[in-house]
Amino acid sequence: MAKLTKRQKAIAAAVEANKVYTLEEAVQVLNSLPAAKFKESLDISVNLGVDPRKSDQVVRGATTLPAGTGKTVRVAVFAQGAQAEAAKEAGADVVGFDDLAESIQGGNLDFDVVIAAPDAMRVVGKLGTILGPRGLMPNPKVGTVTPDVAGAVKNAKSGQARYRVDKAGIIHAAIGQVGFDAAAIRQNVETLVADLKKLKPATSKGVYIKKITLSSTMGPGLTVDVNNVSN
């Protein structure tokens, strides 16, 4: 049997098996673990009472986090004319139309979010095989296809959690970074959970928010008391 590393031993010592944590306790534990060699994100997983095999129970959305994510987000925008100028003023890193599409087809994908004005979708649609697998395809359901490209840029830059329920009925999102204090994480988590509740499918029955888990990139997953997150 392989020996545990110092980090693994520290994690084992800090985590109580089968414990359900308050949000503050979970943040404290994750922040107290030995640091990795890079800035770890704090991630949330929420088990939902949905059946993702049914098209009307696929929960998908984007939540602007009040305390941000701590990450620098590069944004590309497909727009022209006044909308292109507005996107630039809002802080977009790359703005273009046909020229941006050609750049992407050439392999330039140095951005984290793609936003498109509605009239640009005829151009963006041709990039589905490139953007789709990378989770970059603009979609009106998450606010990345919109006439208000400037507003979408500001939201993306300020820090957004984008999510789509997986086959197991779970959504995953970055909610901050290791080092964020508990108050900031609580702001972000409560905002996300409130948005998830607004997205509850009408056909979903029984308990909707079934389980919440908080983890760091290289750390353990800690179960958080659902009732400790405000309704």
From Swiss-Prot:
Keywords: Repressor, Ribonucleoprotein, Ribosomal protein, RNA-binding, rRNA-binding, Translation regulation, tRNA-binding. One of its GO terms (molecular function) is tRNA binding. The keyword Magnesium does not apply. GO terms for biological process: regulation of translation; translation. It holds the Pfam family Ribosomal_L1. The keyword rRNA-binding applies. GO terms for cellular component: cytosolic large ribosomal subunit. Belongs to the universal ribosomal protein uL1 family. Binds directly to 23S rRNA. The L1 stalk is quite mobile in the ribosome, and is involved in E site tRNA release. NCBIfam families: rplA_bact. Part of the 50S ribosomal subunit. This is Large ribosomal subunit protein uL1. It comes from Acinetobacter baumannii (strain ATCC 17978 / DSM 105126 / CIP 53.77 / LMG 1025 / NCDC KC755 / 5377). The lineage of its organism: Bacteria, Pseudomonadati, Pseudomonadota, Gammaproteobacteria, Moraxellales. The gene is rplA.
